[in-house]
């Protein structure tokens, strides 16, 4: 079940053209964009009951990698992989593994 349909559609666009959405593959900027995106969905009255992607992804990341997400999922990934295109690839790889994306966690 895809519990984050609108957010995942947004992330598909980011994955196809990351330079249009963030500078230098900045995961922190992406995480903040997602907070804003979901605030917009909520204000428009179109956010689903389970649309809180950042919280769900942080929970997934903690359970599968044991990385602390106390400062957000982006900081957790960056603490292990550094700020680079590689860390963006790690994020996309983890995203593919999530149950709300349809993967096997």
Briefly describe each language-model feature range:
Residues 1-38:
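Short terminal alpha-helical segments
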Residues 2, 13, 68-105:
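Amphipathic alpha-helical binding modules
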Residues 2, 18-25, 45, 49, ...:
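Conserved aromatic-histidine-acidic binding/catalytic patches
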Residues 2-5, 28, 48, 52, ...:
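Alpha-helix boundary/N-cap detector
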Residues 15-18, 58, 62, 75-78:
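Amphipathic alpha-helical segments within well-ordered protein domains
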Residues 18, 37, 41, 68, ...:
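Short, flexible helical or helix-coil boundary motifs
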Residues 23-66:
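Amphipathic alpha-helical interaction modules
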